[in-house]
């Protein structure tokens, strides 16, 4: 395990996995671009660009937890059109195209939650909330929901898309963290924005939820 400049961990597995993914993509789609967490950008202005996070949840991976996964997005002219979350140990493969979302080939949808006081709220790391966003507002949200847990990284979005949670929040995100999530959450019938309620493709944070409560969540977090 090594540390990046931001002190986040990176493993040999992260690097080897991304190298293999890049090799496959360049063989099959030589004109496509690639943006990866470990090795940066290659032809990022191409019409089609793959965005790769070989191990999302590296801290979980090095701890032996099973909730880590791989994130893959395909962008067309800068917009994500396909997103994948793969949990290899859990044998769960989630794919979305903004219209539908499939888990191991079967359609899944976000559950219909119309009231925040009935919602399950997830986030990746509560310590990052106050560092990047408004801690007091987040604390108020946690008091209003039915259940709050730190089940994060891509596993939190998997739980949201498959109907086991209602709100997933990350106060800071990189492009390789967020792009795959957008077609998945949209395809599962949810809503996904940044912390301010804007286009998540141009923001650096994520708020994803059931459509019925999204505007209220944004209001509580930001306004």
Segments predicted by a language model, with ranges:
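N-terminal subdomain of lithium-sensitive/metallo-dependent phosphomonoesterases centered on the IMPase/IPPase/PAP
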Residues: 1-55, 199, 212, 216-223
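DPxDG-like acidic metal-binding loop motif
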Residues: 44-99
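Generic detector of well-ordered alpha-helical packing
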Residues: 15, 38, 54-57, 88, ...
């Amino acid at each position: 395990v090594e540390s990046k400049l931001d002190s986040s961990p990176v493993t040999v597995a992260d690097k080897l996995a991304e190298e293999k993914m890049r090799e496959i993509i360049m063989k099959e789609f030589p004109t496509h671009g690639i943006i990866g967490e470990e090795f940066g950008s290659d032809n990022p202005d191409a019409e089609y660009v793959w965005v790769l996070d070989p191990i999302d949840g590296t801290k979980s991976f090095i701890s032996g937890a099973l909730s880590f996964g791989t994130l893959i997005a395909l962008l067309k002219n800068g917009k994500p059109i396909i997103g994948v979350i793969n949990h290899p140990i859990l044998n769960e493969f989630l794919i979305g195209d903004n219209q539908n979302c499939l888990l191991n080939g079967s359609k899944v949808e976000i559950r219909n939650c119309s009231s925040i006081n009935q919602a399950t709220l997830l986030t990746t790391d509560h310590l990052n909330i106050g560092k990047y966003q408004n801690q007091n507002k987040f604390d108020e949200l946690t008091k209003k929901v039915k259940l709050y847990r730190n089940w994060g990284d891509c596993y939190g979005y998997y739980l949201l898309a498959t109907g086991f949670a209602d709100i997933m929040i990350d106060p800071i995100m990189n492009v390789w963290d967020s792009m795959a999530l957008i077609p998945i959450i949209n395809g599962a019938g949810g809503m996904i924005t940044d912390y301010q309620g804007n286009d998540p493709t141009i923001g650096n944070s994520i708020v994803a939820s059931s459509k019925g409560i999204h505007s209220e969540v944004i209001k509580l977090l930001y306004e």
